[in-house]
Amino acid sequence: MRILVTNDDGISAPGLAVLEQIATELAGPEGEVWIVAPAFEQSGVGHCISYTHPSILSELGPRRFAAEGSPADCVLAALHVVMKDTPPDLILSGVNRGNNSAENALYSGTLGGAMEGALQGVPAMALSQYYGSGNRDLENPFEAARAHGAEVVRKLLSATPQNDSPYRLFYNINFPPVAAGDVKGIKVTTQGCRSGKRFSAEEQFSPNGKRFIWVKGGDQQVSTAPETDAAANLDGFISVTPMRADLTAHDAVEALKAIE
């Protein structure tokens, strides 16, 4: 198996090294792992692409590249430049430092990389490690993802359903904020929505009077409705949420026919 690995935390992020280990385990001795990751931190960029300006692409070693762009840019660089003659069988994005459950999924560059892979016709999965009191002080806070990541990916590769949608499925996988041995299992979930304040902005001033803002995140330890991603994670389960790039609110289409 030939696997492309990317992320949004950047080429030097510890989670990327964890995902490289997972990918190497999946690829096996006859397989290949290619890395095309952002040269710099790209958290929160979502599915953006840099189509208004070029991106520098640097070769750092065998099958290892850094692009000065978003995770989606990295996937495009891989599929259409560095791997154009040897395309990947699978794209893995992550392992993100922090959860991408609930509304975080909407902002996530980690998911943006996986989504672009799916739009390009390649099976893709985003992997994220929830941080909380149960794992942030561990020697390796990513140990749940490292221990269980390959198993989850294998199960999804063998179980992916056939569908007639033009939008290929991709998967949002979130590992709970616990030690590897405390993971309770896997739950297939829907995307949750946390109640109360989500992201916000705080106004501040520099010593010379310049005005600026800090974007602040909401409470990540707030659970969501049962059977959703964040609820599963905070209960010690790995969440797997199947996703597509189709943003249509299908439940509203019929109700809106009256305006035609």
UniProtKB/Swiss-Prot annotation:
InterPro entries associated with the record: SurE, SurE-like_Pase/nucleotidase, SurE-like_sf
GO molecular function: 3'-nucleotidase activity; 5'-nucleotidase activity; exopolyphosphatase activity; metal ion binding; nucleotide binding
Catalytic reactions of this protein: a ribonucleoside 5'-phosphate + H2O = a ribonucleoside + phosphate
Major enzyme class: hydrolase
Main location: cytoplasm
Pfam families documented for this protein: SurE
GO CC annotations, alphabetized: cytoplasm
Cofactor notes: Binds 1 divalent metal cation per subunit.
Coiled coil: none
Its job: Nucleotidase that shows phosphatase activity on nucleoside 5'-monophosphates.
Protein name: 5'-nucleotidase SurE
Gene transcribed to yield this protein: surE
